[in-house]
């Protein structure tokens, strides 16, 4: 190998490592070490939950925000009950979705989660749901199922399902 070729290869490698290092610095865990949602995880789930539950949430902004905050607390409890390997996978998914590249690639969303309208996030979720790529479908399934489970674990939401509650025995 000539010295000039070796030098070019070295410079290209250094540039690639610098870019990869910069991307790695952008990735923040989706979950805290104790299993609660990190700030980036909360950002993703706030947008996702608002889009999934749009017609079930109050149109009043303050009540809606209170419902979403309560939902995020229930998501924290749900995620903390998951086994460690599932928490690790969810943390990776949320970390990826919190980056620009991950959000664009996996969710097909071109704008940051907080700036996207409910309709745009709904469209993004639908594209994940009906994607030909299994990884996008699985990501949608995880986000949807966690959101729905946490939402309907609250007794106040049961009437939306027509569920009167457990039958009293005795």
How would you label these PLM feature ranges?
Residues 153-170:
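Short, functional C-terminal segments
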Residues 38-153:
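Flexible, low-complexity segments enriched for small/polar residues
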Residues 2, 6-9, 124, 146:
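Short, hydrophobic/aromatic alpha-helical segments in well-folded domains
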Residues 1-5, 17-59:
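C-terminal segment of N-terminal export signals and the immediately downstream linker at the start
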Residues 10-14:
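Sec-dependent signal peptide hydrophobic core
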Residues 33, 109, 157-159:
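Glycine-rich, flexible loop/turn motifs
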Residues 28-37, 132, 139, 170:
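Generic structural signal for short, solvent-exposed loop/turn connectors between secondary structure elements
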């Amino acid at each position: 190998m000539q010295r000039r070729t070796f030098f070019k290869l070295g410079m290209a490698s250094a540039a690639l490592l610098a870019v990869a290092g910069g991307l790695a610095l952008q990735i923040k865990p989706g979950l805290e070490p104790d299993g609660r949602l990190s700030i980036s995880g909360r950002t993703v789930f706030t947008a996702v939950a608002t889009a999934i539950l749009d017609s079930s949430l109050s149109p009043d902004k303050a009540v809606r925000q209170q419902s979403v905050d309560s939902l995020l607390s229930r998501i924290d409890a749900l995620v903390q009950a998951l086994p460690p390997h599932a928490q690790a996978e969810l943390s990776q998914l949320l970390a990826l979705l919190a980056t620009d590249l991950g959000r664009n690639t996996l969710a097909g969303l071109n704008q940051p989660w907080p700036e996207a309208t409910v309709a745009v996030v709904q469209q993004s979720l639908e594209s994940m749901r009906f994607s030909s790529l299994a990884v996008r479908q699985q990501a949608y399934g995880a986000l949807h199922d966690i959101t729905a489970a946490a939402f309907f674990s609250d007794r106040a939401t049961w009437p939306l399902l027509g569920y009167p509650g457990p039958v009293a025995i005795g």
